[in-house]
From Swiss-Prot:
Deamido-NAD(+) binds at residues 140, 173, 180, 260-261. One of its GO terms (cellular component) is cytoplasm. InterPro entries: NAD/GMP_synthase, NAD_synthase, NH(3)-dep_NAD(+)_synth, Rossmann-like_a/b/a_fold. This is NH(3)-dependent NAD(+) synthetase. The lineage of its organism: Bacteria, Pseudomonadati, Pseudomonadota, Gammaproteobacteria, Enterobacterales. Homodimer. Mg(2+) binds at residues 52, 165. Pathway: Cofactor biosynthesis; NAD(+) biosynthesis; NAD(+) from deamido-NAD(+) (ammonia route): step 1/1. It comes from the Bacteria. GO terms for molecular function: ATP binding; glutaminase activity; metal ion binding; NAD+ synthase (glutamine-hydrolyzing) activity; NAD+ synthase activity. The gene is nadE. It catalyses: deamido-NAD(+) + NH4(+) + ATP = AMP + diphosphate + NAD(+) + H(+).
């Protein structure tokens, strides 16, 4: 088995999908989890205005709607969380995403004050954060807020990780990667677009250039620039297609060096890191 085949198998990626079937699969997955653990009353998700959180948010709200209708349990809710750092450049996209999702509840937590306070406390301890590390601080502050909200609403935190993100480890460890349940896991980027199109999402929310937008020195840096490969390249690779050798090498290097991000903390029983 080639490394490409191993990666595809590990991430559960498929070369083709039926959008309606995958929508139903994710909704039923979320409903099944909530029904298995009836003490869970809320799904909590940060909404950025990008493709992934828009899709995950819509699926969460659909799952909650169906479960409320089936059980009559009005205490179930989906909580969409806006987590800007100061003023977000694409705030209108966030509002458009929320209008599309129609969440039960919307909370806004501006993380800038908390991030600056943490940075100052570290500075006083003799640690000056680089712009890149400050970006990770933002991602972790966002997740901290979501877990606080989940803790106070008997909820779980929903993630947006999918195959095209997992393969490169393009997420912050214990930031946006630190979630409870990931309904998009298995899909690549273009497949996520297919689901949103089937759901009637405004096109500009899934045709915009994806960006983590964590660095102050490089605001709205496109993911594809940071990664050195395009999402079309990554999607082709995950669909088992032949890609240029340099593209395959770049993707595989990302996969191998970020393996620790896709695993629990390393213990004496692990040996994957010895390769």
């Amino acid at each position: 088995m080639t490394l490409q085949q191993q990666i595809i198998k590990a991430l559960g990626a498929k070369p083709q999908i039926n959008a309606e079937e995958e929508i139903r699969r994710s909704i039923d997955f979320l409903k099944s989890y909530l029904q298995t653990y009836p003490f869970i009353k809320s799904l909590v998700l940060g909404i950025s205005g990008g493709q992934d959180s828009t899709l995950a948010g819509k699926l969460c709200q659909m799952a909650i709607n169906e479960l409320r209708q089936k059980t009559g349990n009005e205490s179930l809710q989906f909580i969409a969380v806006r987590l800007p750092y100061g003023v977000q450049a694409d705030e209108q996209d966030c509002q458009d995403a929320i209008a599309f999702i129609q969440p039960d509840r919307v909370l806004t937590v501006n993380i800038k004050g908390a991030v600056l306070a943490s940075e100052q406390a570290l500075r006083e301890a003799g640690i000056e954060l680089s712009d890149f590390v400050r970006g990770n601080e933002k991602a972790r502050e966002r997740m901290k807020a979501q877990y606080s909200i989940a803790g106070m609403t008997s909820g779980v935190v929903v993630g947006t990780d999918h195959a095209a993100e997992a393969i490169t480890g393009f997420f912050t460890k214990y930031g946006d990667g630190g979630t409870d349940i990931n309904p998009l896991y298995r899909l690549n980027k273009r497949q996520g677009k297919q689901l949103l199109a089937a759901l009637g999402c405004p096109e500009h929310l899934y045709k915009k250039a994806p960006t983590a937008d964590l660095e102050d020195d490089r605001p709205s840096l496109p993911d594809e620039v940071a990664l050195g490969v395009t999402y079309d390249n990554i999607d082709d690779y995950l669909e088992g297609k032949n890609v240029p050798e340099q593209v395959a090498r770049t993707i595989e290097n990302w996969y191998l060096k970020t393996e620790h991000k896709r695993r629990p903390p390393i213990t004496v029983f692990d040996d994957f890191w010895k390769k």
